[in-house]
């Protein structure tokens, strides 16, 4: 992996970079569409590439349970399995274990849990997480960590953070695939001193990149922003900085302001399937009756396939009729919006105009459409 900073904005910590993996180069800050089960829901790999996606995320937990990492390896690895020739980042499985599965035990060795699919009992340790991610063959792997819940006491957050640090060291020791980069994950809940302590310890171990985990897990926006502002700028400047599972367009803008390079979130794809579509002025719920006779596209001037061809009225009809095309068209638009948002921020940073761009971004959102019915 090679990561280089191309430009910095003088008004804040925002930075424009370029990251090269074994499967290509992409510009940062970047948004990674989530391909939970070796698929970004409703879209083909060719469509993702046409949208301008250069890296996607795969979920180790889901792929471990079905179809199994060993099977994916036998079939040539995740890139070949899903016919995606660009970069892939896999998470460690930690977040899904703590959010989806029924946990039986958290031990020093790892986590024993029951599958959310069939109730079968499994265990994930730092070593098995690394083995799975190496079998999948992603370009970037994540250390196995404990996803700290919210709310927790300071004492538990510290205990959890220290366990994550120990698991990170074991993850690094077990990781033996040279062409696959390994990122450490900074934990500590909403306690900024614990986050800084965790970061110091991870830097001592040494990783190719560093991520902030366990954000947007129930804490307030103010608490999340406080952690971002206090910790993100202190992540090693020469390494990629990643905030996991975040978030809204506003979250991405504030993350970039704080110096974050990489983001992933299910929001654009999940919201698309629920009929919530993103525009520069905010979100619209396409099922609302006000769009029944609306002949306009989702967003005037949007160049996505959906907006160039279809009206809000048609999209509303498809959604209410539960036509599969609704999910595809909505997803195409939402990912086009998210990827375009990142491109606009990269351009603003390169022009040393991020602060002005950010003010314009929020001004547009103040001019929302009238309240929906």
Curated annotation (Swiss-Prot):
What highest taxon heads this organism's lineage?
Bacteria
Q: Which catalysed reactions does the entry list for this protein?
A: 7-aminomethyl-7-carbaguanine + guanosine(34) in tRNA = 7-aminomethyl-7-carbaguanosine(34) in tRNA + guanine
UniProt entry tagged with the keyword Glycosyltransferase: yes
Pfam families attached to this UniProt entry: TGT
| Entry-linked SUPFAM superfamilies | tRNA-guanine transglycosylase (SSF51713)
The metabolic or biological pathway listed in the UniProt record of this protein is:
tRNA modification; tRNA-queuosine biosynthesis
What's this chain's function? Catalyzes the base-exchange of a guanine (G) residue with the queuine precursor 7-aminomethyl-7-deazaguanine (PreQ1) at position 34 (anticodon wobble position) in tRNAs with GU(N) anticodons (tRNA-Asp, -Asn, -His and -Tyr). Catalysis occurs through a double-displacement mechanism. The nucleophile active site attacks the C1' of nucleotide 34 to detach the guanine base from the RNA, forming a covalent enzyme-RNA intermediate. The proton acceptor active site deprotonates the incoming PreQ1, allowing a nucleophilic attack on the C1' of the ribose to form the product.
Q: What is this protein called?
A: Queuine tRNA-ribosyltransferase
Q: Which organism is it from?
A: Syntrophobacter fumaroxidans (strain DSM 10017 / MPOB)
Q: Which gene encodes it?
A: tgt
């Amino acid at each position: 992996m090679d990561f280089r900073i191309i430009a910095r904005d003088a008004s804040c910590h925002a930075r424009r970079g370029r990251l090269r993996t074994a499967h290509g180069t992409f510009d940062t800050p970047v948004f990674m569409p989530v391909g939970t089960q070796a698929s970004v829901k409703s879209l083909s790999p060719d469509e993702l590439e046409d949208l301008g996606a250069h890296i996607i995320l795969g979920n180790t937990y889901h792929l471990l349970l079905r179809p199994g990492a060993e099977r994916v390896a036998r079939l040539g690895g995740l890139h070949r399995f899903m016919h995606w020739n660009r970069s892939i980042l896999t998470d460690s499985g930690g977040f899904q274990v703590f959010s989806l599965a029924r946990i039986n035990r958290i031990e020093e060795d790892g986590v024993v849990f029951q599958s959310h699919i069939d109730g079968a009992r499994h265990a994930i340790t730092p070593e098995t997480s690394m083995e799975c991610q190496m079998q999948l063959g992603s370009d970037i792997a994540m250390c196995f960590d404990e996803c700290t819940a919210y709310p927790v006491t300071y004492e538990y957050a510290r205990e959890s953070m220290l366990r994550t640090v120990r698991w990170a060291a074991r993850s690094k020791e077990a990781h033996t695939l040279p062409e696959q980069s390994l990122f450490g994950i900074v934990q500590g809940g909403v306690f900024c001193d614990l986050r800084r302590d965790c970061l110091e310890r991870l830097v001592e171990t040494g990783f190719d990149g560093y991520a902030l985990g366990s954000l947007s897990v129930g804490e307030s926006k103010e608490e999340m922003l406080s952690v971002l502002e206090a910790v993100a700028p202190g992540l090693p400047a020469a390494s990629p900085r990643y905030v996991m599972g975040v978030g809204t367009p506003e979250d991405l803008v504030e993350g970039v302001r704080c110096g974050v390079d990489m983001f992933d979130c299910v929001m654009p794809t999940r919201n698309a399937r629920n009929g919530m579509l993103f525009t520069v002025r905010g979100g619209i719920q396409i099922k609302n009756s006000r769009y029944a006779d609306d002949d306009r596209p989702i967003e005037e001037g949007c160049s996505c396939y959906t907006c160039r061809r279809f009206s809000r009225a048609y999209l509303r009809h498809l959604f209410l009729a539960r036509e599969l095309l609704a999910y595809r068209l909505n997803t195409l638009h939402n990912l086009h919006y998210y990827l375009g948002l990142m491109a606009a921020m990269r351009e603003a940073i390169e022009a040393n105009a991020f602060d002005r761009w950010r003010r314009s971004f929020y001004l547009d959102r103040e001019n929302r459409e009238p309240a929906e019915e």
